[in-house]
Amino acid sequence: EMCIRDRYHIFYTGYNRDYPALGKPSQVLMHAYSDDLVTWHKTQDALTFTPQEGYDPDDWRDPWVIRDEENDQYLLILGARLQGPKTRQTGRTVKFTSKDLKNWKFEGDFWAPDLYTMHEMPDLFKIGDWWYHIVTEYSDRSKMVYRMSKSLEGPWIAPKDDAFDGRSYYAGRTFELNGQRILFGWVATKDQDDDDNNFIWAGTFMAHEVYQREDGTLGVRIPETVWNASEPEMVFQVPDNRGYSLYRKYDTVLLPRKHCLQR
């Protein structure tokens, strides 16, 4: 979502599961605008965003738009894959550019590492001198990874620890709030709430604060607003001469920050 001259713009995925049987793509990108965030007006821009030749028409989704100040244009990225077997590792992020948010030009691949079967929920933001590109990789690992670059043209560098959280912290995106970059995604639930069962399509919302380390890589931590949401409850004290105590918040056992090991 973007606000330009008091008008809000939202770009989203339009989906029709019956279209493939009619020879049409099941997914297209859509554009709507609003002056009050209540009443929205769809545009007819979907035709501009149809899957391009050579790309899978049924895996073309999750647009993300930023303002590219250096080139005086808007940049839209989305998740895609090449046409072919779904098991092939042809996932990529593709890009469009525009001067007015209405007329878009397809610019090809933005990041195409051929490491994953699909890129989902791509994100792009800048902290200091570094650009960061986040995707949720659709594979057996199903986790969020990121790359970093000092230019939107790349090269995109893979840090040693390139993931946020673990397996099945999924489909996250970020926003900036009061100078903080918050990453919000969901953690999948196991069938019948049994750890030995498969993941199911549902889960628990989880927010991380993303912060930049001195070397430019990213880390995550619990947002202060979450820490401050409730008072800790004493669970028990460890009977040793260091006097450590364990507290519980939201049914999770936490060690107070002043006792935590620092990286």
Residue ranges and their predicted role:
Residues 1, 5-62, 66-121, 126-165, ...:
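Beta-rich carbohydrate-recognition and catalytic domains
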Residues 166, 171:
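Active-site/pore-lining binding-face segments in mid-to-C-terminal subdomains
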Residues 181-183:
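Short, well-structured beta-strand segments enriched in hydrophobic/aromatic residues
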Residues 236-263:
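Secretory/extracellular carbohydrate-interaction modules
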